[in-house]
């Protein structure tokens, strides 16, 4: 409790039915689910999007075009181009539709910095270098960053959520 503080009761909407699927991988599929929910009068308070980004691009909708920026940079809507993005052509409009249905939106994400395939994700490489340089990830006693072992997200970094600066950086990247 010293680390996290006392437990706080979550808002009421947290206790309602949640809609979620790892198979909704585009705005059209999500909009179809909203229509089905309305047509069949399925009660829900939350819609969870799991496939909104891939696991390497952790802070923006997948397929958004942008310039590569230093790892300290936090992208805003105006910097992201969805012109050629057929899967998520307008995340802002989709979020508004979800809200119009009276739902809260949760973007599911593993809180990791995934090791990208060499050269395929230059922005992820910038973000990882910045996190390591600033000790925003869990570090080994040797001073090297801890990397996930075999299995899920092999080679990925874990963000150090006990570091207030790491938390602020992570939150700013998602704002």
Report residues per predicted region.
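Extended acidic/polar, glycine-enriched regions
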Residues: 1-7
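Aromatic-lined carbohydrate-binding/catalytic grooves of carbohydrate-active enzymes
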Residues: 8-175
């Amino acid at each position: 409790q010293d680390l996290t503080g006392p437990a706080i009761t979550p808002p009421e909407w947290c206790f309602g039915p949640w809609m979620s699927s790892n198979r909704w991988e585009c705005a059209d599929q999500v909009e179809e689910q909203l229509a089905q929910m309305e047509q069949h009068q399925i009660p829900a308070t939350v819609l969870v999007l799991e496939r909104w980004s891939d696991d390497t691009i952790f802070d923006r909708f997948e397929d958004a075009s942008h310039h590569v920026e230093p790892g300290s940079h936090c992208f805003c809507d105006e910097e992201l181009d969805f012109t050629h993005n057929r899967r998520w052509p307008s995340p802002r409009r989709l979020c508004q539709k979800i809200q119009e249905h009276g739902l809260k939106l949760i973007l599911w994400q593993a809180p990791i910095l995934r090791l990208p395939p060499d050269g395929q994700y230059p922005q992820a490489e910038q973000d990882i270098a910045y996190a390591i340089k600033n000790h925003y990830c869990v570090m080994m006693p040797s001073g090297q960053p801890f990397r996930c072992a075999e299995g899920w997200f092999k080679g990925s970094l874990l963000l150090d959520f006990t570091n207030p600066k790491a938390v602020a950086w992570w939150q700013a990247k998602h704002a």
